[in-house]
């Protein structure tokens, strides 16, 4: 499961890295503690213009066939995205990339759960594989655009903390994923050698704590740094 992450790279830099037009105006501020049901940035692909765009979607996919917006999914298991009722249509037609600079998981210990930040060794941003969909309110006729983060088997690093991890796509697969050219075969664990996991402050437990202090080193004696 992936239920919390951060995005601290600004939109202008994301545009340079991921090849989409720079937005005329900044859309969302950076965040150190992104939680479900919040608006997030996602990169989508327009098959008509063959261009990428940066858009704001709500984290928690509401299926297009849902009677209301109460049912939503924050994660989609990679193994079932082509069979689970909510995901086949977006899997085939509505894929996205979700920029991040790190994600958080909690490791169970005798002393309680210890939060970890899992990130790239070089501190660079990366993208989760995602799906998006549109749901129309039957009363107001307004459209709600939502998204989900795909999860899969953990790599050796994350397996020490949790049984699953978000699917991180390497750069050479971005175009294949967005265009729909690939299947589930590219949804693999990201290489362990490129990542680190470090214990951080328990302030991260509350989504309202959204500042750099949530990344301060945590209980090293109990947790230890995972490399």
Which ranges hold each PLM region?
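Short linear sequence motif anchored by a di-proline
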Residues: 1-227
């Amino acid at each position: 499961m992936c239920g919390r992450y951060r995005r601290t790279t600004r939109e202008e830099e994301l545009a340079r890295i991921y090849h989409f037009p720079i937005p005329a105006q900044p859309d969302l501020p950076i965040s150190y503690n992104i939680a479900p049901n919040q608006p997030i940035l996602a990169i989508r692909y327009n098959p008509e213009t063959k261009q990428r765009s940066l858009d704001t979607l709500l984290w928690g996919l509401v299926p297009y066939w849902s009677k209301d917006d109460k049912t939503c999914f924050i994660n989609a298991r990679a193994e079932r995205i082509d069979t689970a009722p909510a995901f086949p249509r977006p899997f085939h037609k509505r894929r996205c990339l979700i920029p991040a600079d790190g994600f958080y998981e909690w490791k169970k210990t005798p002393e309680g759960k210890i939060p970890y930040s899992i990130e790239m060794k070089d501190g660079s941003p990366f993208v989760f594989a995602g799906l998006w969909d549109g749901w129309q309110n039957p009363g107001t006729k307004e459209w709600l655009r939502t998204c989900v983060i795909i999860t899969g088997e953990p790599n050796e690093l994350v397996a020490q903390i949790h049984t699953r991890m978000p699917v991180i796509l390497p750069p050479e697969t971005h175009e294949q994923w967005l265009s729909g050219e690939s299947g589930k075969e590219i949804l693999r664990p990201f290489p362990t050698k490129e990542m680190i996991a470090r214990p951080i402050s328990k302030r991260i437990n509350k989504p309202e704590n959204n500042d750099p202090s949530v990344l301060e080193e945590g209980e090293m004696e109990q947790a230890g740094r995972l490399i």
